[in-house]
Amino acid sequence: MRTGLLPQLRRWVSQGRPGLLPLGLLNGLRRSALEERHRWVLWLPVALGTGTAFYFAAPVEPPPWVAGAALGLFVGLVAASLQGWNSLVRACLAGMAVLTLGFAVAKLQEMRVAGPVLTRPMITHLSGRVTGLDWGSKGLRVILDQVRSGRLPDPPARVRILIQKGADQISVGQGVGLTAQLMPPPGPSAPGDNDFGRAAFFAGIGATGFSFGAAQSTPLARPPGSWDRLTGFVEDMRARMTLRIRAQLPKSEGAIATAIITGERGGIDPDDEAALRDAGLAHVLAIAGLHMALVGAGLFWLVRAALAAIPALALGYPIKKWAASVSIVAAAFYIVISGASSSATRAFVMLPMMLSAILLDRPALSMRSLGLAAVILLLVRPVSITEPGFQMSFAAVASLVAVAEWEQRRARLIPHSWLYRHIRGIALTSLVASFATLPFAMYYFGRATHYAVLGNLLAMPLMGLVTMPSAALSVAAMPFGLEHAPLQLMGWSIDGMLRLGRFVSGLPGAVTVTPAFPLSALVSITLGGLWILLWRLSWRWWGLVPVAAGIALALMAQRPDMLIASDARTIALRGEDGRLHFPRPPKDRFAAARWLLRDGDGRDWRDAVGEASLSCDGLGCIADRNGLVIAMSSRPESLEADCDRADIVVSAAPLIPCAKPRLALGARQIADGGGYAITLSPLRAISVNRQRGERPWVITEPVQ
């Protein structure tokens, strides 16, 4: 029976004994849970994801034996859940078992990918085998394995190098030698920011950098094995397709066409990307369910229609199964050439389930198929749980499935014309997906778009009817050298989408830059949203409580008054106007841009340099904030005077003994901490690496 929240709460409480009000609540929760026992299975992916998240949230790296212990606990809990308990106890034991499994597989992935990580910057000559190419606006980024270097007795398994000269001569599988500036993979720009070092670690990359001059061809350290030859063939095919697309289309259209076909986004103009993102069209660039549905489902209906036109085949053979098989093979090829991102893999895993449902005349999308896709992804690649693409993709699809269930019931009651349903479907899909991904977009990218529905209403017909069909035709025509015409059509449609994106993103109030908030707020909102989406009875609306708590945590978040990058020379200080300012032009411009974005400030860093209350000279800068004197020393000559008069000393040089300051940070301490965020009231300094914890991807050795 469906009832409102308050009547339900009063009924639960009244059923408890006097003085034991929680008993009524617990009994009410138990009854609601038993009524929805058929949906308990939907919480197993949540338990698995929670276990993997616990691993990544650990403050120190668990020792290897913990993985074995967790697997043993998993087996024990599974065995216990099969005993003669009541169904609710068995479900709880199964959930705990899956949670421990998630922790174990995450640790096992770390053990599988663990390798040497560069601890300090250096210039060295190195050689290696090219395993991946990514063309960008600044040049060619290559991934090298079989790395050898005289200065590195234990080199990283893979390094990522930017090459600007002679890049046209490099191909996948080739051995190259070059002189490069190598650096450790970058960490977060501030506590709580995206951890790029962790992403590099789980991609097997132990160093990044750029080359001096052109790369030279060198012999390989060892011949490639069968798997290396296969992956090399795939990457070489992707690279050749990328070059052929860009040779046929102008820069902007070619870069976006490449992103849609091969998944390579490095060459997209930042202004074009910003226009699409602020118009609510960022999903066009990230291969996911939209692309896979247009390829897989579109090809299914096309092949089925073609076969149905032949009476002998239509009457005597299972043409729907044939069409489904062709669709799955095509989608598999698409995911291979597109790089197999988390969102694309999720969509591909769901495609056979969707087609099977269509063959059985059942709803194509369901929470169970989505949950199975999540389980497969998390078991194969647990680090996906930390990636924005994974989180946003599943949030959007889960919300769309929940709304689709409601829509199917409503559509039977209120029939409408095909055109009305089509327009309403695009608008509702855009609205639901935008709302579901809003917390993640605000947390990771600091932006909230307001005209996503309009952008999608204008651009999606072009995407579905022209862009994706012409992309499929161009790929099919490439082996015959006939891709020019379909690529030109694709370029025309992309130009149209860019024009629409610029129009929508240029409307007043199209986007709001939002300040950063703590991870706990995002977790609370996510758990509340899952409670609402995965249950069906009225108790689902109790999920609004953690959602409201998460919003409150986000609104109450304290912003840092001072930020220091790991180079100790890039510093931002909150001014009297409440905004961040840079005493001097920042050396680490990426960090500077991230700080402003996370502060909810849409300014370019160039517009934030200097402030009236800052006093600077050749030795450093002095500021007075909240009654505290802050000295930012850029040369060692000023340290003695700064230590005598300042409450906070930040030095780009090694620190001398300082007695007076309440807080003193020198270059080595700042580098070892990976940067700092400081609040003045109360005075507190948090290092980036302290928040990251003692993990294999965290570099704690001081930079010399």
Task: Kindly label every feature range from the protein language model.
Residues 1-38, 85-88, 99-283, 654-663, ...:
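Membrane-interface helix/helix-cap signal primarily in integral membrane proteins
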Residues 2-58, 357-358, 473-484, 488-491, ...:
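Hydrophobic alpha-helical segments
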Residues 36-80, 387-390, 394, 482-533:
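Membrane-embedded alpha-helical segments of integral membrane proteins
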Residues 51, 128, 180, 260, ...:
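Divalent metal-coordination and catalytic microenvironments
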Residues 62-63, 104-119, 552-565:
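Aromatic-capped interface at the extracytoplasmic side
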Residues 65, 73-74, 80-95, 209, ...:
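Hydrophobic alpha-helical transmembrane segments in multi-pass membrane proteins
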Residues 165-168, 172-175, 179, 198-205, ...:
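Non-globular, low-confidence helical/coil segments that flank catalytic cores
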Residues 451-460:
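Non-cytosolic membrane-interface motifs at loop->transmembrane helix junctions
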